[in-house]
Regions:
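C-terminal motif of bacterial Sec signal peptides marking the signal peptidase cleavage site
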Residues: 14-17
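Bacterial signal peptide processing site
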Residues: 19-21
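Surface-exposed edge beta-strand/loop patches
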Residues: 30, 73, 114-158
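Contiguous beta-strand segments within globular domains
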Residues: 43-54, 64-65, 69, 110
Length: 158
């Protein structure tokens, strides 16, 4: 019996060693614009946050990016800020380019995230800023993926 058990265990180990993980699609190394100076006297003024994501498609099929959103979470403030640490903003209308990643290839995805800021007139008060963690969410033909940027995005205001 022990010899038979040893043979079975050896066969299972050989099978496990010879099998490979299924091909996947993955996102790595996301970054966002480090800072944006909100124009003095702005009230909910629109601007764009730029991000990049490294994508790797190890599958045999093209992967299409169907939609994207971005979640910005306020992680720290300096001075007087309209929002509190922990407040979240989910941006819709996020644009990703290119919208496809070829089979067995890598691509740098350029992401534009609509945002807005408010600032008093410069010189009328002490400067303030808010730092945001940015998490990007992509729905693709290979499934749904999320990745946090390795840096924060800071909005600077009067």
């Amino acid at each position: 019996m022990p010899a038979r058990l040893t043979a079975v265990l050896t066969a299972l180990m050989v099978l496990a060693a010879c099998s490979s993980a299924p091909a996947t699609f993955s996102l790595t190394r996301a970054t966002v614009d480090p800072a944006y100076w909100c124009p003095g006297g702005s009230n909910n003024a629109p601007y764009t946050v730029h991000a990049t994501i490294q994508a790797r498609n190890d599958t045999a099929n093209e992967v299409t990016i169907d939609s994207a959103t971005a979640e910005m979470v306020l992680t720290s403030v300096s001075g007087s800020w309209l929002e509190r640490v922990g407040d979240r903003y989910v941006a819709e209308g996020v644009v990703v380019s290119p919208r496809t990643v070829a089979p067995r290839s890598s691509a740098t995805l350029a992401v534009t995230v609509p945002s807005a800021c408010t600032s008093a007139v410069y010189g009328s008060s002490r400067s303030s800023s808010g730092a945001y963690e940015v998490r990007l969410h992509l729905v693709t033909s290979a499934g749904a993926f999320s990745i946090a940027a390795s840096n924060t995005h800071e909005i600077r205001a009067a």
